[in-house]
Amino acid sequence: MSSALRSRARSASLGTTTEGWDPPPLRRPSRARRRQWMREAAQAAAQAAVQAAQAAAAQVAQAHVDEDEVVDLMADEAGGGVTTLTTLSSVSTTTVLGHATFSACVRNDVMRDGEKEDAASDKENLRRPVVPSTSSRGSAASGDGYHGLRCRETSAMWSFEYDRDGDVTSVRRALFTGGSDPSDSVSGVRGGRKRPLRPPLVSLARTPLCRRRVGGVDAVLEENDVELRAESQDSAVASGPGRVPQPLSGSSGEESATAVEADSTSHDDVHCTCSNDQIITTSIRGLTCDPRMFLRLTHPELCELSISYLLVYVPKEDDFCHKICYAVDMSDESYRLGQGSFGEVWPLDRYRVVKVARKHSETVLTVWMSGLIRTRAAGEQQQPPSLVGTGVHRGLLTATGCCLLHNVTVHRRFHTDMFHHDQWKLACIDSYRRAFCTLADAIKFLNHQCRVCHFDITPMNVLIDVNPHNPSEIVRAALCDYSLSEPYPDYNERCVAVFQETGTARRIPNCSHRLRECYHPAFRPMPLQKLLICDPHARFPVAGLRRYCMSELSALGNVLGFCLMRLLDRRGLDEVRMGTEALLFKHAGAACRALENGKLTHCSDACLLILAAQMSYGACLLGEHGAALVSHTLRFVEAKMSSCRVRAFRRFYHECSQTMLHEYVRKNVERLLATSDGLYLYNAFRRTTSIICEEDLDGDCRQLFPE
């Protein structure tokens, strides 16, 4: 017999006074259903407000009748008292009725001439739900004040927030009080603290990165939609470096509307949430969050209070934007430290950098990973004194702060990365061993304790600090950039980031494991490269969870081979870059462009030629020990590929083998093997190059980069 209970809209729970209200488990509602809930909540809120106004008017009328009786009794004794009491009664009636009418969002009697312009835009927002707010979801007449349910719906954010300040009801962006100017109220209340109203969130997924300059100079943004510009002007701060920038001209309104609709649709699919200072209620099944957790946090942190979800609470200080976002000098592009598909990296000071992502989903993933790593590493191993408070845990770089408004995360600053490091000497081989052991330990920790696969192990994502007195010596190394990271399959539907800034909860996407989206094409592990060449739609072969870690360590072996070539080639770094590395990256760009354009066959063809360059790297560094690698790869290509693709593979392999000769590295390899640290790195590279087929991923990861 099916249950007669039905799910109802959480925002419309006005008639119940149940303590500790918790929403029933809900299936993922559609956008139409959630919008219907919003309309029902608005109607119920309006009806409750009218009832509250009528009840208040009735009480005042009854009080007026009682006072009239008293006046009649006193009229025989003192005639002047009648006028006094009647006047006081009328004033009281006017005050209460005015307050009740004001709570019902009828504010014509307190409108000023300066408010007429905001009235037109407020009419549209009055259709949004305004409900009485108590921790127990009581009736409209209960409680000592009203909560206003504010719907923030812009091109890049859709959330609902309660504002409360005594007898204040929030409508749209400002807090209105009886007879006050809405433009004078520029602060909201959440979590018991005053918070300034923020400018609207600008999506960098569809606009170029903003240029901001210190000292209050206007920044440059693309033109947004009319509502976004209006909200920007209303919520701007009149003075200081945080002035809202004026939009650029030149973009059509139709294109802007299309972008806004697409962005809001995607955001609608992600979350729809209601929050106040007592509870954060989300559309995620059975999930409610406690905003009081933010009071004890200074960095993103995993709070394992629920066995069903991995909640990372992301706090934000009130003055974060003024201390971080507006303090970054973007006036000169020469200051920029890095740029790529993820966004841009700019220096903040000597010890910190700011990463401005192009997609908000990447920022959400970064802070969730940061909280997970920081919490799991806290009980595993004590940090070195030099890394305390820097956000580096177990060789993994984490974010120490986040701003969804500007799509910004704050990280520790390193000297350079391993790709741009140009000082390689055999005398510092011990520091190279420590660096790669740290990276291998970070990968094992990330897979075993955090159950997350990085999927982007490249020299560009390995940050290093060098000895200023000896630039060839690597002091410390850390793995960064989690834009391609995915949790293990058993973490699907469980990973959530909760933001204090917006009072919302954002779910981390489930793992997809499409091989074409995993790893840089030039550093992809050879077993996965072969699977992608045969089938561009292939996914990660999940026959066992140990395959994830083996794949990651195999990619780290490719990075090690990349660095060993720079270290051992007697021709020098310039020749290696113009010859060997140019061949390795020759078809990587074509593979990425084909993937962006949806030409998967062209992508697999480019990966086939990259496989030839990877094979040449191994054959050059290993010499006769690399013969098995070459023969196995050639047999695979001849058995799986067409004759024309085989000819193209052989032709490019011949070109690579002419440039990557073992004679160029033979003498330095002998010197490398004469040291214990060099022998360790050489054997580690040999073991990773032995992972050449899918079955090799079932090996023991402890044999790779052993401690």
Swiss-Prot record:
Q: Which UniProt keywords apply?
A: ATP-binding, Host-virus interaction, Kinase, Modulation of host cell cycle by virus, Nucleotide-binding, Transferase, Virion
Q: Which Gene3D superfamilies match?
A: Transferase(Phosphotransferase) domain 1
Query: Which transformation does this protein catalyse, written as a reaction?
Result: L-seryl-[protein] + ATP = O-phospho-L-seryl-[protein] + ADP + H(+); L-threonyl-[protein] + ATP = O-phospho-L-threonyl-[protein] + ADP + H(+)
Report which superkingdom the organism of origin falls in.
Viruses
Sequence ranges of Low complexity compositional bias: 1-14, 178-188
Q: Where is this region: Disordered?
A: 1-32, 115-146, 176-199, 231-264
Its subcellular locations are:
Virion
Entry's Gene Ontology BP terms: symbiont-mediated perturbation of host cell cycle progression; viral process
Under the heading InterPro entries, the entry gives: Herpes_UL97, Kinase-like_dom_sf, Tyr_kinase_AS
- Molecular function terms from GO: ATP binding; protein serine kinase activity; protein serine/threonine kinase activity
Which residues fall in a compositionally biased region of kind Basic and acidic residues?
Answer: 115-127
One cellular-component annotation, GO: virion component
An example Pfam family from this entry, by short name, is: UL97
Q: Where does ATP bind?
A: L337, G338, Q339, G340, S341, F342, G343, E344, V345, K359
SUPFAM superfamilies attached here? Answer: Protein kinase-like (PK-like)
Physiological role: Serine/threonine protein kinase that plays important roles in several processes including nuclear viral egress, viral replication or regulation of host cell cycle progression. Participates in the acquisition of tegument during virion morphogenesis in the nucleus. Redistributes the host nuclear lamina by phosphorylating cellular Lamins-A/C. Plays a role in viral DNA synthesis by phosphorylating the DNA polymerase processivity factor UL44. Stimulates host cell cycle to support viral DNA synthesis by phosphorylating host retinoblastoma/RB1 protein.
Similarity field: Belongs to the protein kinase superfamily. Tyr protein kinase family. HCMV ganciclovir subfamily.
Relate the assembly described in the record.
Interacts with UL83.
Other facts: Phosphorylates and thereby activates the antiviral nucleoside analog ganciclovir used to treat CMV infections. Phosphorylation transform the drug to a toxic form, that leads to successful suppression of the infection, while the uninfected cell does not have this ability because it lacks the viral kinase. Mutations in phosphotransferase may induce CMV resistance to antiviral therapies in immunocompromised patients.
- Can you name this protein? Serine/threonine protein kinase UL97
Source organism per UniProt: Human cytomegalovirus (strain Towne)
